[in-house]
Curated annotation (Swiss-Prot):
SUPFAM superfamilies assigned to the protein according to its UniProt record, in alphabetical order: Protein kinase-like (PK-like)
Catalytic activity: L-seryl-[protein] + ATP = O-phospho-L-seryl-[protein] + ADP + H(+); L-threonyl-[protein] + ATP = O-phospho-L-threonyl-[protein] + ADP + H(+)
Active site per database record: D200
Annotated transmembrane regions: none
SMART domains with a match to the protein in the record: S_TKc (SM00220)
Residues with Phosphotyrosine modification: Y147, Y248
Phosphoserine carried by residues: S204, S234
Name of the protein this chain belongs to: Probable serine/threonine-protein kinase PBL7
Knockout-associated phenotype: No visible phenotype under normal growth conditions, but mutant plants have reduced sensitivity to BR and enhanced sensitivity to BR biosynthetic inhibitor brassinazole (BRZ).
PTM annotation: Phosphorylated at Ser-43, Ser-46 and Ser-234.
Enzyme class: transferase
Amino acid sequence: MGWIPCSGKSSGRNKTRRNGDHKLDRKSSDCSVSTSEKSRAKSSLSESKSKGSDHIVAQTFTFSELATATRNFRKECLIGEGGFGRVYKGYLASTSQTAAIKQLDHNGLQGNREFLVEVLMLSLLHHPNLVNLIGYCADGDQRLLVYEYMPLGSLEDHLHDISPGKQPLDWNTRMKIAAGAAKGLEYLHDKTMPPVIYRDLKCSNILLDDDYFPKLSDFGLAKLGPVGDKSHVSTRVMGTYGYCAPEYAMTGQLTLKSDVYSFGVVLLEIITGRKAIDSSRSTGEQNLVAWARPLFKDRRKFSQMADPMLQGQYPPRGLYQALAVAAMCVQEQPNLRPLIADVVTALSYLASQKFDPLAQPVQGSLFAPGTPPRSKRV
């Protein structure tokens, strides 16, 4: 995972399996988490921890154990790479389980601060739609995080980096993923005290198990949200270009609605198959939200926004409703955006309405003439 200030221009991305965005001007003050900040997080979130009787405390691993698990970080075990370092698939003999092991680059984008925040957050928080942190390693200058292994990779892999021969996501699976990701965000916003602002929601941070069940990952940028009569927390602007809420990019004032905006961008990606920022497109279509806003105003154009990879196999009413949710989430004014709980309600309903492509006609004509409808995902 990599970050750049949200207000900056998108830089060229390295072609890796994970985002290769660039983080700029990381200050030395970011390389540690203050004792008061850690204490506040621990005490404030302790109630959430105590409510989860099935919570598993993160284990500590030696570097030697993780080297053995990945066969000395062999290239064949590499499953992801980005500005933070590399992710390997490994087998933990001590727990008899397969795991994803993230080895942070000493000179990479994720410093000690982000490492500590992620260990702290994922040790205290537990929800089916959050990735499970198995443990970590802090031997000498080595920093590694050990997660449950998610065999289908990230949502980004299935929307934008589809390998040859891989079937695109069908409509039902897309709505299932959208609803699950929203539930993970709802847990952070509404089920913890104080709330947690994720701050880095994007397709590459939504991981999928072998049944396309989504889990949010990478909590290095997460912040404790406002409490009492405070409406926001002020922080240096960090995130990924294309996903940041405009008011956060301009002022550094972070709210729960900042996450809702980011979710709206992700939902648009799920529906349209387009990237949040795509420099390969014409000028007016490079920014997904800017491209979508004029189309939101004319329902007759909604079918133009459906991912061509769906080949017209989607429910028109479901498409309109999903786009309506996305449009509300990416409103420029944060007070006009819905609460994430309302988003969960809407998307859970859409996910429950199973679409049968064999029982309904193909919509539109955006796919190539003569292209046969795809078979249903098994």
